[in-house]
Regions:
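Short beta-strand elements in bilobed, periplasmic/extracellular small-molecule ligand-binding domains
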Residues: 1
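Flexible loop/turn connectors
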Residues: 4-109
Length: 109
């Protein structure tokens, strides 16, 4: 009930045109509530999730999402762990690794 109240009290009168959610599950739940409130997605409001969960592509309106590239993160972590295992006597220096996320554009934006 709190989400419905927020939609009616804040989103509709506030002129908000998009929402970035912390994950795809929240985006999926919010999608249902927005549609129930009579809003169109992405017409009235755009919606973007985070995680690129498989279900986000199969939602009533497939959800645009940010893929944080977990495969690359895991690959870097495994490589670093193997380096430590193979060279246990050396001093290991912290490394900064950047993995580029990807915007997966679907129907909610």
């Amino acid at each position: 009930a709190n989400v419905r109240q927020l939609i009616h009290d804040v989103l509709i009168p506030g002129g908000i045109d998009g929402i970035l959610t912390p994950n795809d599950l929240v985006a999926l739940l919010l999608e249902g509530e927005l549609l129930s409130a009579g809003l169109t997605i992405p017409g009235d409001i755009a919606l973007v999730g985070f995680d690129n969960e498989p279900f986000s592509a199969c939602a009533q309106i497939p959800i645009t999402t940010i893929d944080q590239n977990n495969g690359s993160i895991a690959e870097y972590a495994i490589r670093m762990l193997l380096d430590i295992i193979q060279d246990q006597n050396s001093c290991h220096v912290a490394r900064k690794i950047s993995v580029q996320p990807e915007l997966v554009i679907r129907k909610t934006s």
